[in-house]
Amino acid sequence: MKVAFFGSPAVALPALNSLIQAGHEIKLVITQPDRPAGRGKKLTPPPVKVFARDHGLPCLQPEKIRRDEQVLEALKQAEPEVNVVVAYGQIIPASII
């Protein structure tokens, strides 16, 4: 099954990994933008982005998903059969659901 995955923190990783292990085709990963973290406020990618990069999955990081035409276009091109959302952190508009 073609899947678009929305998630950001480490808690979302088991679900994404399970989808891959079950043989589903991850067409697109959408996660939060990199944010400052730690004492030095170093720009840090969300765990889902790191996982996507390590597995060669296409990944987008919109600041505001409601206002990002690139996300809508990428979803149209990816043609997912289902969207899976696990701890994404933004309200997903009806135009995407």
Q: Which positions does each model-derived feature cover?
A:
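One-carbon transfer enzymes
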Residues: M1-I97
